[in-house]
Curated annotation (Swiss-Prot):
Family statement: Belongs to the REF/SRPP family.
Name used for this protein in its record: Stress-related protein
InterPro entries xref list: REF
Pfam families: REF
Induction statement: Regulated by heavy metal stress, wounding, and virus infection.
Function: Plays a role in plant defense.
Length: 167
């Protein structure tokens, strides 16, 4: 738009060159006009075509895919409305029991493999020791005021022991 304004301003002020500018402009219009007339609606036609194809695709998409899409939209709107931390807490409280059940089930399946129980009995005490040391370091760094410790989670060793000992 600004280029057109600048062009018309320069054309008006062309002085003795104005007839030459008009001749060149007419020659360009003669060459470009048929091409423009033929192709200026192409972007609109492409959009119409794409819209039709999306409509056709929508008819062929299975209903469960549409349902997942609408659920994703509702999740995004919930996150926008309530905030990420509220949403994360809701998801955590909803799926934590399921994750625990899956972990216990996987543990039982692994214990059925040959040699796994012996390897687990050898590794678990060291892993428990390292986990306790990690938790102690995080707690002590938080007490000393290191900000990074606020972002590092504690490993819930008591909860893990309770979940796996109950089975």
């Amino acid at each position: 738009m600004r280029c057109a304004i600048l062009y018309s301003y320069a054309k008006e002020r062309a002085g003795p060159l104005k007839p030459g500018v008009n001749t060149v402009e007419d020659a360009v219009k003669t060459v470009v006009a048929p091409v423009y007339d033929r192709f200026h609606l192409v972007p609109v036609e492409l959009l119409k075509y794409a819209d039709r194809k999306v409509g056709e695709l929508d008819r062929h998409v299975p209903s469960n895919v549409k349902k997942v899409s609408s659920q994703a939209r509702s999740v995004v709107s919930e996150v926008r409305r309530d905030g990420v931390s509220t949403f994360a807490k809701t998801v955590y409280s909803k799926y934590e029991p399921t994750a625990e059940q899956c972990a216990v089930s996987a543990w039982r399946k692994l214990n059925q493999l040959p040699l796994f129980p012996q390897v687990a009995n050898a590794v678990l005490p060291k892993a428990a020791y390292c986990t306790e040391k990690y938790n102690e370091v995080i707690v002590s760094s938080a007490e000393k005021g290191y900000r990074v410790s606020a972002y590092l989670p504690l490993v819930p060793t008591e909860k893990i022991a309770k979940v796996f000992s109950g089975n």
